[in-house]
Amino acid sequence: MRKWKVDDSVELYNINNWGKDYFSINTSGNVVVTPKVNGPEIDLKQLLQELQLHDVSLPVLLRFPDILHNRIAKISKCFEHAAKEYEYQAQSYIVYPIKVNQMRPVVEELVSHSNQYNVGLEAGSKPELHAVLSLNLDSQSMIICNGYKDESYIELALLAQKMGRKIFIVVEKMMELRTLANLAKRMNIRPNIGIRIKLASSGSGKWEESGGDVSKFGLNSSELMEALSLLEQEQLTDSFKLIHFHIGSQVTNIRRIKTALKEVTQFYVQLIKKGYNIQFVDIGGGLGVNYDGTNSSVTGNSINYSIQEYVNDAIYALVDICRKNQLPQPNLIIESGRSLTAHHSILVFEALTSTQLPAFNDEISIDEDAHELVKDLYEIWDNLTPNRIIEMWHDAMQAREDALDLFNLGLVDLETRALVERLFWSIARDVNAMASKSKHLPEELKRISRSLPDKYFCNFSLFQSLPDSWAIDQIFPVMPLTRLNEKPTCTATLQDITCDSDGKIDHFISTANHEYNLPVHPLKDGEPYYIGVFLVGAYQEILGDMHNLFGDTNAVHVSIKNNSYVIDRVIEGETIAEVLDYVQFDHKRMVRAIEVWVNQSVKQGIITPEEGREFISNYRAGLYGYTYLERTDNVFFSQTKECDS
């Protein structure tokens, strides 16, 4: 048999497609990150070993700020190329909606390039506006105010505009426009007004309903006419400078974007002809990420276009409509959050232990007085052939069902049930192996493969670190980070450490028949098995919840300097005391309660004073420790084992 090569792992995990430009596998079989174009590679195994020396426990979120810079530069370069090709004379702006990832280091890294790349920020709520205004933005950096707004929100934005910030208040509802007009008059400020238009066009993919006639935000055509009347009545027509639309996040199909652009450019033409000085067209978000590497709109986890095509279509739509109608070209704004931030973060955790379904082998003997159902199943297992595979599978299922019924009636003992289970699941494995070679697989045989993978129990919380995986079945690239020069002989689903059966990853990038399982290696005693989840920089951190009180993970910022990597910052994850404080458990009162209980137990002779002191010490240490499982003597619970093929 040919020896497994790194190139085989590259193909198996599809890393060259979803990880293009940033992630690959080196000759040692370790995943490497290349944050800078033509820059040095960072071996993730070496990085994790160094973090261990710094007492940084897993799970950990690895952030690479240089990738953020690269994403901005890439989008900006696409704008430059399109502007040159289509003779676009106006300005283009990249506006980052901070809802995608509000972590201050992420936002600060993006705005540090504001002057060079026309990077601005979008706030969709009062808290987000407060955050944006506190940052050291360039005076010409665009600030877009979206979302529902009350008087205090609008007043804050107007005063910030008066002090020199380039702020646009985008009206989502008629009520907001009335409030804005009243406040602007009272404060004697000429506002920069934008209006979000509710297009008939909608996006595609998981967030399709964010656009279209029934979408949550924006003014339809009738409401827009009402808004125009109010602007004239309040003498604010010259303040109306921006139109905005958003057809949904992660738009998978470029044709939906083209359709929306056609629609919005007609709004631009109509408004200009009515005498409104529209200077900006904000096409919102939607620029997607190729999560599964397929470059297809079919899966729902990828996109069928490139950044360049997206930008080309946007700029061409504006240039073409203006040329045909002899109108000035408006400035273009894109609110790209997912595409900017997704690639820069990797979640890393360890597999703790694993379980697998029982198996039968020739070393197990079947006694002559064994139950008839056991003998029947053994006969099926011993004589299974491809030409009778469906019939024999039906027989096996019937035998198992009969055995379970008899066990429930007390007519079959535990030893017999255990043998039945071993035989049945061994038959299932053999049936699956034979069936996988068939071109036309019956649906009932397809379902077998979903039951067979091992369960790898991993030190993370799906609900805290990958909420979209649970909530909307978002698929992220997942793969082992080491031993990729070895053949992965196991398949597994990944189970988190919450007490919830939903806490698992059982959908993966569909390559080589592994849609419902991940190819992995057998665990080895004393050797950590690292697993990485990639492209998690958008939404996951801020949407995560504290199911079972698992808090934020440790986070590490890694940059490239002087042709090598540097650990810039280690942000400690939440302690048990900190997460308990969220649910109103005061850690000082808790310790006092424990001390009272221990003292009573010592006085009653239930425990010794030494045991009491040890208990209090352990309680305190745990209270101020990590919410996730921590290594003891460099060992978790893993065991060396081979996988059933």
Where are the model-predicted features located?
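A non-catalytic, amphipathic alpha-helix used as a structural packing/dimerization or gating element
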Residues: 66-74, 226, 263, 313
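Short, glycine-/Ser/Thr-/acidic-enriched flexible segments
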Residues: 30, 38, 67, 101-103, ...
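Active-site-proximal beta-alpha core segment in soluble small-molecule metabolic enzymes
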Residues: 87-280, 289-293, 304-309, 317, ...
